């Protein structure tokens, strides 16, 4: 990591509260938000982007992660089929306590910002086609926080039912990204899964720059046993992590092509 990126991470870390490294308390199924895993062409450029967003570089033994309150961003170099747009996971969204100050930093760095007349909401395009929704929320207790991950299936009720059954999520309708429009969601501790109907079948997230989303699970072997019995597709069985001796992982995929890593022991 070059000196400039390191200095941005140090500054961001000084603004974060120590407690924000903890993941949310899991739901009754033992599930909470965990991580978002990106495959990118330029790791340094991606690290810089997330540092400017307010992330803090941390490590779980050999596993380097960019920490935000309640979630981690993992970045790995790799070839991809494209960015997030056109994938089942179109984008994810962050809330910012002081949005004008945050946007001023983004403009200095030259990042592309899209807004439709609402000064409190918009999208920023990161390296490798990572689309990030943003909005201001002055009531936040931290400078920045994950708000939602936005999925676009053809069958919204079926997706809600699947995430309720497999991950113990709670169906809801919420205004996402500062909008007044109520859309279908699934509440998971630490993140909202926003679900909007797509008229066409979108690509799987696998192989895209946002390759998969991650959930931290309490008692992962029991979770996988239960999920498989309920019809979930286990694409990689339980295995120890190659990066941390205290962590184990598995992969599942929903019926719409959303690739998910389920972990136990993710946080440093």
Feature names for model-found ranges:
Residues 6-18:
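Bacterial N-terminal signal peptides
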Residues 20-28, 103, 107-151, 173-197, ...:
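Vicinal oxygen chelate
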Residues 26-31, 82-87, 139-145, 204-208:
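Short, low-complexity disordered segments enriched in Ser/Pro/Gly and basic
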Residues 28-30, 37-73, 114-123, 151-193, ...:
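Core segments of cupin and vicinal oxygen chelate
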Residues 45-47, 100-103, 220-225:
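Short, conserved charged micro-motifs
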Residues 60, 72-96, 100-121, 199-205, ...:
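A cross-kingdom feature marking solvent-exposed beta-strand/loop segments within repeated
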